[in-house]
């Protein structure tokens, strides 16, 4: 014979310390849960990336040039130094209602046409099937105020015809390319690119609402510090539409800049257009008066001296008119205390003084000459003013036409080839990480709040005797059937381990229990042993049946009574029928002396549970059950009673009054210390002493590997 002993041990950590090894071990034990939850998250992310609406991005580049300085007062020589425009102000201007509102009007963005698809997944499915390009182009859509809250649906009949209806009862039939007018509703469909039967929802948004949407999707940033170059980015679902929108925004921004720069010239032209007819009218009146005076005085000629005075006066009036224009320009730049403004005023005063002197010389002339000089001066001054206005008008027209503004579109809008979002790789990776984190946290929390007994030492430290520690049988586990009921796993043995694999370590542990029971029951009042459990599905029936089998192998007559009249299945495990079982005996339908049924194991008999009664607890309290126990105790060397869990029903507390020894089964890493203590407390309240606890299904846990040590034994025959 050969014997092998393997010991795995590690130091015990303090209870107040964070045991990293235990945490890692707990995660390793629940690795399939972690992998499963992580896989579910990853699959959800993959499905999302397939069905999520792709968002595209278009960008354009705009340069804000320095002011070219096209002022009409450049000849003054004291203009301010040119500076680049403030980028922040220009960014706000691009995002203003002035610019975006014109884009909404130009592209009819206040009219939205969306295809009706299955919620959530419909649009994604259409993209996968290649039907995402079905559209209906609507350029005009208006409805009365009383229909503002109604939903309008456009149903495609073919590539030319359609019907328009609303949830308010409106219905009409239209044709592409023709204006539909009915009951105050006007609709212009330019083109239909959709299969017959397709439905679209036509919505009319407010201009302000669409401007807000444009502002949310538009991003304007400055490239560099005070570089004067702005980058415009617009995001959306339609590749072509976002490009057109961004081009329209850039173009409208440029146009408003030009309009702003030429606004001064435009206002001056409007003023001149108003003044020129009046000046021309006054000139005509002056010419008529001069001609009439000459005809009346027979064409009086002026002497050379008077003519020189007249020329000087006309010249001074022309200079005064020119100064008037210059003063209008310079007053926009400076105050009257500025040197340039003061120089102009001094020049005007000098001309006024000179004009006053000339008027004095005219006064000294004869009356006829005075009148002819005055009339001639009015005509010539009027002619000069009129010509100055005409010249100024031409200059302003040239200025207006030559205004290019400060904005230049460097790069027109173009849609980037890739998808901006969703980022499939990042989403899937993030889902995997999230699933991994949540599953690990869930496993650790479950382990923290539901920590089962992981060592016999835990029970012994609290004064609870451990009669046996039965290891988990991999052989039995492979043959067990498992059902999950309300989240709880129900294990059911299909073959007795003591018969199928008698050398299993679990059977060796049960044989050790058999030896311990021999001494434990020496002082008992009878030879009846009750086996109960803390909770369901902990292997109580497994321990009880195999214990009965190994005891019967010592040439002792053993009777196993299945008192679990609700869920007992020992008759299936031992291969007997369930006829005339315990429930029939207790209600008087069966004979006690013939109730025991032999099993395939010698000296091992069984009383099955019988048919499920409506009142198992009441039957166990009957005198009939006491008679059965007394008869069994007299006719067998050992009587084992398999009872339901004490925390589930009270059957064990009733049966315990008839037995001499009671043992309780707890499952390793499943039942908690609190559950064991509560179970013992219930037996104590009913006056039933419990000899000890059997810790069942012990296995080497990754989380407990380093705590109390783990032993593996092999003891087999030598190979020959």
UniProtKB/Swiss-Prot annotation:
In-chain residues carrying the UniProt-annotated modification Phosphotyrosine: 569, 708, 710-711, 713, 715
Compartment list: Cell inner membrane
Keyword Nucleotide-binding on entry: yes
TM ranges: 32-52, 425-445
Keywords linked to the UniProt accession: ATP-binding, Cell inner membrane, Cell membrane, Exopolysaccharide synthesis, Kinase, Membrane, Nucleotide-binding, Phosphoprotein, Transferase, Transmembrane, Transmembrane helix, Tyrosine-protein kinase
GO cellular component: plasma membrane
Pathway: Glycan metabolism; exopolysaccharide biosynthesis
Membrane topology term: Multi-pass membrane protein
Primary localization class, coarse: membrane
GO-annotated molecular function: ATP binding; ATP hydrolysis activity; identical protein binding; protein tyrosine kinase activity
Outcome after substituting residue 569 to F: Loss of autophosphorylation
Residues on Cytoplasmic side: 1-31, 446-720
InterPro entries linked to this entry: AAA_dom (IPR025669), Bact_polysacc_biosynth/exp (IPR050445), GNVR (IPR032807), LPS_length_determ_N_term (IPR003856), P-loop_NTPase (IPR027417), Wzc-like_C (IPR005702)
Enzyme Commission code(s) on record: 2.7.10.-
Post-translational events: Autophosphorylated. Seems to be phosphorylated through a cooperative two-step mechanism. First, Tyr-569 is phosphorylated in an intramolecular reaction that generates a significant increase of protein kinase activity. Then Tyr-708, Tyr-710, Tyr-711, Tyr-713 and Tyr-715 are phosphorylated in an intermolecular Tyr-569-dependent reaction.
Secretion signal, residue range per the UniProt entry: none
Protein's GO biological process: colanic acid biosynthetic process; polysaccharide biosynthetic process
Note: Additional site-directed mutagenesis experiments indicated that the tyrosine residues at positions 708, 710, 711, 713 and 715 are phosphorylation sites, whereas tyrosine at position 705 is not.
Function: Required for the extracellular polysaccharide colanic acid synthesis. The autophosphorylated form is inactive. Probably involved in the export of colanic acid from the cell to medium. Phosphorylates udg.
Name of this protein: Tyrosine-protein kinase wzc
Organism listed in the record: Escherichia coli (strain K12)
Gene: wzc
